[in-house]
Structure formats: C-alpha cells, structure tokens
Amino acid sequence: MKKIFFAVMSLFIGTFAFAQQNLMGTAVELNSPDIHEDNSVTFRVYAPKAVTVRLTGDFLPHHIADNNGYVTEVPIWVDMKEGKDGIWEYTTDGPLAPELYSYMFRIDGLPYADPSNPFRHRDMTVWTNYFLITGEEGTPGYMYDVNDVPHGNVERVWYDSPTLGLNRRVSIYTPPGYEDSKEKYPVLYLCHGAGGDENSWLDFGRASQIMDNMIATGKAKPMIVVIPNGNPMAAAAPGDWHAGLYKASMSGAPNPETKAKATIPEAFPDLMKYVESHYRVLKGAKNTAMCGLSMGGGHTLQTTAMYPDKFGYIGLFSGAVFQNDIEKLAPLFAKNPKVYLVACGTADPIAKFSFDFADALKAKGYPHETLWTDGAHTWKNWRHYLMVFAEQLFK
C-alpha cells in the first residue's frame, strides 16, 4: 500500500511541477502558429534531440495517394529547418487565403500535435491542431470566426430513444433571440460522418459560428439546428456516457461485441418527437431540412426516404450513397422537395458514388442540384456545403 501511495504521489508531484514550470515561464514557449501581417504563417516546435521534423497541413500542396484502396488527395509532408536552441521552423511560401486550417508535426517518424497551440480537434482517434486566417465578410475565414454579431446558444441535452434502447445525447443550436421570444422556428437536422459524434459539427465543422454569421448577414433564416449522434450503439461521444473512456472507431461502438437494436433512420422519430415537444419548432416538410456528410449523408438519404412527408430540404455531402438507393426515393419526390442537393469533391475517394447517384436521379427525372468542388473527403468542403445548403433553406 505504501509503495502505491508513494508512486501516486510521485506522479502527482511530477505533474504539478511540470504545470508550475509552464506557469512560471521556465519551459520553452514558442509562438506557433505565428500568423504574419501578410497572412503567411510560421510554425515552430522545440525538439533539440530530433533528427528530422516534418509538417503536414491542408494548406500545403496535395498529391494523389492510395488510402485503404481508395485513391484520393492528401497534403504533402515538408521538412522543417532546425535553428538555434533546438527550435525547428517552417514558413509558408506565401499568404494563406482566409480559411480554417489544420496541421500536425512528425518528429523522427512519430506524429505530434503542436504543444504551443491549444486549439485541437479530434477526427476519430487522430488529434490535429487548427488555426484560423480571418478575412472580410463573406469569406470562409469570416464565416468560421466568432464575430461581433448576435449569438445563438448551444446545449447538449439527453432524450429517450426506446427504438435504440438508450438515453441519448444530442447537440441543439437555437438562433439569437430564441430565449427572449415566443416565435417558432424551422429545423435543420445536421448529421456527422463515421467516427464522429454529436460534437463534430460544432468543433471543426464550426456549425454554430456559421449559423450566427449567416443569420447576422442575412444569408440564412433563423433556424434551430439539431446535431444528433449517428452511432446507433452509442448514447453520446466517447467518454461522455456510462460506457466509459473507450476508443473512438468507425462503427462508433464502445466495443466490437456491441450490437445495435435498430438503425439511425428507424430511430429518427424518437429524436423528432423530443425536439418538437421541447423546442418551439415549425412543423411540416416546408419547415424541416436534413443534411449530412459521408455516413451522415447516407443517414440523410435513408431517413428522408423512410419518412417522405417530413422533409422539404435534403443535402448529401460526400454522401455514403449508392445507385440502388434511387429505388427508395419515389415517395419522397412525389412530395416535391424544394431542395435536393448532392455535393462532393472531385478528388474524394467516394466521389464516384455521388456522381453515379446524381446520374441516377437525372435518369429518373427527379429534380436535384449538384455541387462538384475541388478537394477530397475534408471538412473544408463540408463547411462550404453547409453554407451553400443553409442559404437555400426555408425561403
């Protein structure tokens, strides 16, 4: 028992000493990323014993690579240069456009986050740093920033899903002024991709900032945004429910033996019932939209097909969609949805599915829009698609 006590105390003291070292300013403190006046950026990391230090980020040139059998674009790795006192640096070749960017280091072959940058996001099990190049109104850098505009509120609430046998968590954005009025609002259901959760669109997706800024600039109507957890075996994000601190995975299950009692589309009425009974929402297809990225695009397709009288606006972003899904859509298109958007990056490893699906929609004579952009399976594209979609809603 004494050995355990002293081991724990040693760990505590060591951790406390490290924290005090940072508080007292005796650790190496660097400005990284260092955004210059011309919007070029310098990255720095202290690695005095390293042999090689490299950097990758979505602001760097991309090259074609094989990703688990799918051909896609990925950013290159660049070498950082060692300077004095063991500090390695890299400066971009020129200014970066206003946008939200992510990056990471590789020190002697091992991935590292930037210890000088506290802003990080998790994509399944991978953590990367991010930074924002701000810009003029209307630019991505402006739309993803926290500007001096009226702000909505975000709450994470729990609702009962008898279909899944779980008490589940959902993130809900209410627009500016919601608390001070009796007005009712239309609803957008916004779905994440595989490996994500109810936090994803709020973290690197910047959904609340996008909605605040779009509403403030008149580009979008005030609306409630519902961001569910799309993993039928999970109640909430890893570590935020009673399954404990488990590792995130593509399936979203806390362990491989976990089986879902139903699918997310089958359980959707549980969520809609909660939203419509706890929030001031305008009901009906003309006041209800749904969109999602990747797996969430598949959930959007399946859910809107399963409940064709519920949705008037549908958006599939790099969606997990397939040509044979088209056979399920006749009841939905008989209701004449106002918007049916299919969006994807031309370098996305699953772009062919979106292209083929759009061709099948056209062959059936189903009214729809397509949005093909540069880039791959990335948040840069999905944030843009959300803005394009949100601007068309409820008008």
Residue positions per predicted region:
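Bacterial Sec-dependent N-terminal signal peptides
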Residues: 1-21
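N-terminal edge beta-strand
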Residues: 21-39
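Low-complexity, intrinsically disordered/propeptide-like segments
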Residues: 8-9, 14-15, 26, 33, ...
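Non-catalytic cap/lid and distal C-terminal segments of serine-dependent acyl enzymes
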Residues: 35-77, 81-395
